Regions:
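Short, flexible hinge/linker loops that cap or flank conserved catalytic cores
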Residues: 7-10, 144, 224, 303-306
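Conserved FAD-binding catalytic core of PHBH/FMO-like flavoproteins
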Residues: 71, 91-93, 99, 103, ...
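Short, flexible helix/strand-to-coil boundary loops that buttress conserved ligand/catalytic motifs
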Residues: 51-52, 68-69, 164, 324, ...
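Conserved mid-domain beta->alpha element of the FAD-binding
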Residues: 17-33, 37-39, 44, 151-152, ...
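A short coil-to-beta-strand element that immediately follows conserved catalytic motifs
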Residues: 267, 278-293
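Active-site-adjacent segment of FAD-dependent monooxygenases/related oxidoreductases
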Residues: 44-115
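Extreme N-terminal leader/targeting segments of oxidoreductases
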Residues: 1-14
Length: 382
């Protein structure tokens, strides 16, 4: 199509997607299904590893899987019927009926990856520069690609966002999330039973831990085949952030330390703290975790998701605190709404203007909601 003044709905848009993880695949699949000519470029050379474990499977995520992939959501999700808060001794403080649905990063990634054509998913291709006016991308190897539309779905560390908005950067929220997953088979029967069919929490001073079952590494959702996903939000409480985020190789990381890379003294100190600061069942879960990891909690707000014929999608534009349980859902919604906007408007300019306005507003509201939730739960609001 001519780049701007023809209807994207009438002819194919050529689309370059930078980023082949969750946001990029939501985009690639949604636009491919809408009839556009999409190519996805992922900087990693091989298949992506799981980057976080559990996901709350919001309705928009389940709907996307049902409509656009071969996966039936019920086959890749777990459910709970009760939300439970524990006391420090492990007794039940409150229990309320609350139906929740969960899945795992790897289950959703596999479904999306299988739904997108192999010949248009390119690994080892890192975008290093973009020209928004022409939707052109330059890669690390010096090659270039022009398209009608460029979508940067590169996550919270997006280099494209840094180029388009150099004054925008993530703001540290003054606390971290320790995380891990444990095969159900590694838990005692009593501990596994304590978390079965329950979304379980414990709130301490400047601390909040939660846990729920997710599909196993091969997608198993039957008892015994699952994994228990846990997240422990924790204020730094005087600890040195630089020391905490220095990995086993001695490199200081800005956003966190991945599984298997924690320094032994840091990991040992947090495990020791778990044994005294958490209820017995949660302490047992942390003790059974092979490779816990830690991530910094950040807030990120971008003034606009659209610059000319380039747009930012998902965490590349907005990072809300995980308490919202909406990061994956927002990426799916961004992608679906982008496909709808291209179909509903006569020109690319009009489509991007409408989409950018609506999704920027949604992202801003989500970030603010995450701030309120996190500050309230961690006692940081003053």
């Amino acid at each position: 199509m001519p780049h701007d003044d023809a209807a994207c709905s009438a002819e194919e848009c050529t689309v370059t997607v930078s980023g082949g993880s969750m946001g990029g695949l939501f985009t690639g699949v949604a636009l491919d299904r809408a009839g556009h000519d999409v190519a996805v470029f992922e900087q990693s050379a091989g298949e992506l590893r799981s980057r976080g474990g559990g996901i709350v499977a919001q309705r928009s995520v389940r709907s996307f899987l049902s409509r656009h992939t071969a996966v039936t959501p019920q086959h890749v999700t777990t459910t709970t019927s009760e939300r439970r808060f524990l006391t420090a001794d492990g007794d039940v403080r409150t229990a309320t009926s609350d139906s929740m649905t969960f899945t795992s990063w790897d289950a959703v990634y596999r479904a999306l990856r299988d739904a997108f054509p192999d010949d248009r998913y390119h690994t080892g291709r890192r975008v290093t520069d973009v020209t928004p006016a022409t939707a052109a991308a330059t890669f690390a190897d010096g090659s270039e690609r022009s398209a009608d539309l460029l979508v940067a779905a590169e996550g919270g560390r997006s280099s494209t966002r840094e180029q388009l908005f150099p004054d925008v950067s993530p703001e540290f929220a003054d606390y971290v999330a320790w995380r891990g997953v444990v095969p159900e088979s590694d838990l005692s029967a009593d501990v596994a039973d304590a978390f079965d069919d329950r979304f379980t929490f414990y709130q301490g001073t400047g601390s909040l831990i939660l846990a729920y079952f997710i599909p196993g590494p091969d997608g198993g959702i039957d008892p015994g085949d699952r994994r228990l996903n846990w997240v422990w939000y924790d204020t730094l409480a005087g600890r040195d952030r630089g020391q905490l985020f220095t990995d086993a190789s001695g490199t200081e990381q800005r956003f966190g330390v991945p599984p298997g890379k924690l320094r032994a003294p840091v990991e040992r100190r947090q495990r020791d703290r778990a044994s005294t600061a958490l209820p017995p069942t949660f302490a047992a879960v942390v003790a059974a975790t092979d490779e816990p990891f830690v991530q910094a909690i950040y807030d990120l707000t971008t003034p606009s998701m659209v610059v000319d014929r380039a747009c930012l999608l998902g965490d590349a534009a907005f990072v809300a605190r995980p308490h919202t349980a909406a990061g994956t859902a927002k990426a799916a919604e961004d992608a679906v709404e982008l496909a709808s906007a291209l179909d509903d408007h006569d020109t690319l300019t009009a489509a991007l203007a409408a989409w950018g306005r609506d999704r920027t507003d949604a992202g801003s509201r989500l970030v603010e909601r995450g701030k309120r939730m996190g500050d309230d739960r961690l006692g940081l609001g003053g």
